[in-house]
């Protein structure tokens, strides 16, 4: 099992490292640059260059069944689920086969509404409650991935 992190704008990198170390699990922080190497023997920084979604493409090409992913990117979450991985977003929302379709539809609707100017606000600020929800959810994801592997 490996934890894949869509790291460019991830606000919970430190929490991922804590959980990954506790479970002694390899963590790959994938980005397009600008991040420092995570301070953990279990973590590796993967820098991909090129087109806009190069980090997403790298994760989708390397992730597999039983792996874990952390991303707020709904299309990437969909690709990872289709590969058999288990995931969570930085606010603690579990990505599942049951909710990814509705999440994609909502994302597409909101994109259309923003383009027409009907919606101008974005996501609410990330706070301590989100961080706590992520830690709880990440532990559940790790247990589910370990059970799937066994």
From Swiss-Prot:
Pfam family, one: DUF188
Domain of life: Bacteria
Family to which this protein belongs: Belongs to the UPF0178 family.
Protein name per UniProt: UPF0178 protein Mmar10_1466
């Amino acid at each position: 099992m490996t934890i894949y992190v869509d790291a460019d704008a991830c606000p919970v990198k430190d929490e991922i490292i804590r959980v990954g170390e506790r479970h002694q699990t390899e963590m790959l922080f994938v980005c397009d640059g600008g991040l420092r190497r995570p301070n953990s023997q279990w973590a590796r920084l993967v820098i991909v260059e090129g087109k806009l979604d190069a980090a997403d493409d790298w994760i989708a090409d390397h992730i597999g069944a039983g792996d874990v992913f952390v991303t707020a990117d709904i299309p990437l979450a969909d690709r990872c689920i289709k590969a058999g991985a288990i995931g969570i977003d930085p606010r603690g929302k579990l990505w599942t086969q049951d909710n990814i379709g509705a999440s994609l539809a909502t994302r597409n609707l909101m994109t259309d509404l923003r383009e027409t100017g009907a919606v101008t606000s974005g996501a609410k600020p990330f706070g301590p409650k989100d961080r706590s929800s992520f830690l709880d959810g990440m532990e559940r994801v790790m247990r589910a991935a370990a059970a799937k592997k066994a």
